Structures are given as structure tokens and as C-alpha cells.
């Protein structure tokens, strides 16, 4: 019978072989906090950047963001574009849904004058354009909105009642086989937005599935499930959504982390709201009753007033964000411990304190 030491050696050899064959990050311990040294683009949400383990979405990889309608998928990707443009990166948006609003994009901080936009006629054209942009090596971030709208040419040219079983899945599988190597070589981030469908006849387990077959699930290094969990109200008026994102797959750090943040209408992700929540959670912002204090100074009664103070003092907000980013990305064990402690205290999640 093999000893513990022999088993550990055999396991280490097996893990080494798997990583050699399938790439680093293809297998890891669930509690492993070690992240790969990969260049990342911020999502615009500090808590999501921390949950991803590397400070954002990984360059040179495929990412899938999926969720129900109006859950914040496009808002999140536009936020990624805004952050990438701040770093001088070139971005492209392949709008297969023909629904991109330039005014809304500009409100989220996107430089619409520098953003490359394509509205293709069919799925083949969209993926060929994506392939050409990746091969150029000059584009850093490409968003495809959405997989469900990548309609094969044969379906568009056919009759309404014609059956086109598996056409889109085959199209995606072929395109991803072609794209994946080029994406790695050009160090380009390609984000596919996807929609949710219900599987018919599922009695047990989750009936939800994403469109476009299974290929994207395999090729994606990161998969994010985004959901709206509630409304944010100011009096009787609804001013935004409470949003929850779960990292359902992550090949560059530990998966299955979950974060909550707010998306405000016309503004996008509420950065000041996140700073207050994370600041309190990691003891950089003090909370006594309804009062919030930062650096020993009271900054507001109630979360809305504390957020307003940070908006009026951008230098203090930037200093707090820098402190949090440096501390949490450098100490992922602390993040994991804080998440476990929070889950033990309450399973209700974050609530809007307005």
C-alpha cells in the first residue's frame, strides 16, 4: 500500500502532466489563492476585479458574460471598454444585436470617437470581422454582443419555417477553433456576451443553458454569470439595480467567487458604493450606527451621504480605491477569509442603504 508521501509525489506528477498538456490553471485546488501572472483589464468594478483574482479580465483569453435580459451584461462590457481606453488600448464592439446606444456608452465613460463598431449582417460575417481584428494584432479588446444574435447565413436566407438544427453551434465551434490560437498570440481580450435559454423537460437540476452550443463553455478562460437581485430606490423612484456576479469558471485564479455591486441608471457601476462597502468590510472605513467615517473624519450619515462625500472628494476616493486594490490583490487569503466570515454572519447579501 502506497504511503502518504508516495501518494503526494504521484499526485504532484499527475498535476504536472495535466498542466503541461492542458496549460497552467487547467487544474487547481478549490481553496488555492494563487493566481497566474497574466495582464488584466479592469472591469470597472473593484469587487469584481478582486474576485477574478488578477485585477480584471485576462488579456489573450476568451471571456463569456451571460445572464437574463436587462441584468447588466452590456453595461459591464462597456465599463471594460472605458477602463481599457483609459490605458490607451484600442477597442472594438461587434454589435450583432444592432442595439448599441452611443449616448449611453458615452455616459459610462467610453470614448465613442475612438471605439471601432461593426454591425454585421450575419453570424459568419461577425466572426470573420472578429478574426480579422484579432489577426491584425492592433486591437486589444473585442466585444461580441451577442452570441444569440450570431445568426448563420443559411438561416437568414432560408424560409421562416425551415429547420436549421445545430447550425449556430457548428458555426461557434469552428470559429473558436480558428480564433483561440490567434487570440493568445495577439494578446487580445475577446468577450462574448451570451443569453440564457431554458432546456425543455428538465425535472431536476438547473434548466438554464446558454446559446450557441457547448464550444464557448470550453474555450472561455473566464465565465461570468450576472444577475439583477433587486432595485435601488430613492424615495419612490427606482434609480438602479442591485447586481450579483458569480465567477462560474476561472482558469487564471480560483473560481466560484461571488460579488454584489450596484448599477445606477445612466451612470453604470457605482464605484463610490463599492468603495464604501469594501472599505467597511476590510476595516478601512469605520461604521458606527448609520454614520460612516474615513481617516477619523465623519463623511456622512447613511450610505448615500457617504457616497456623495466620496464623489465630492475624488482624491480621497482614489486614495481609498488604491489602498483597497493593493491590499486585496496582494492578499487574496484575506479576501477569502472576509467572504467566509460575511457568509457565516448573514446569507442575505448586500442591501441598499438609502
Curated annotation (Swiss-Prot):
Keyword list (alphabetical) reads: ATP-binding, Cytoplasm, DNA damage, DNA recombination, DNA repair, DNA-binding, Nucleotide-binding, SOS response
Q: What is its main location?
A: cytoplasm
Q: Which InterPro entries match?
A: AAA+_ATPase (IPR003593), DNA_recomb/repair_RecA (IPR013765), DNA_recomb/repair_RecA_CS (IPR020584), P-loop_NTPase (IPR027417), RecA-like_C (IPR049261), RecA-like_N (IPR049428), RecA_ATP-bd (IPR020588), RecA_C_sf (IPR023400)
One Pfam family of this protein, by short name? RecA_C
Q: Does the keyword Ribosomal protein apply?
A: no
Coiled-coil-forming residues are none
PROSITE patterns from the xrefs? RECA_1, RECA_2, RECA_3
Q: Which GO terms describe its molecular function?
A: ATP binding; ATP hydrolysis activity; ATP-dependent DNA damage sensor activity; damaged DNA binding; single-stranded DNA binding
The places in or outside the cell where this protein is found are: Cytoplasm
Which sites bind ATP?
Answer: 67-74
Query: Source organism's superkingdom?
Result: Bacteria
Function recorded in the entry = Can catalyze the hydrolysis of ATP in the presence of single-stranded DNA, the ATP-dependent uptake of single-stranded DNA by duplex DNA, and the ATP-dependent hybridization of homologous single-stranded DNAs. It interacts with LexA causing its activation and leading to its autocatalytic cleavage.
Q: What is this protein called?
A: Protein RecA
What organism, scientifically named, is this protein from? Pasteurella multocida (strain Pm70)
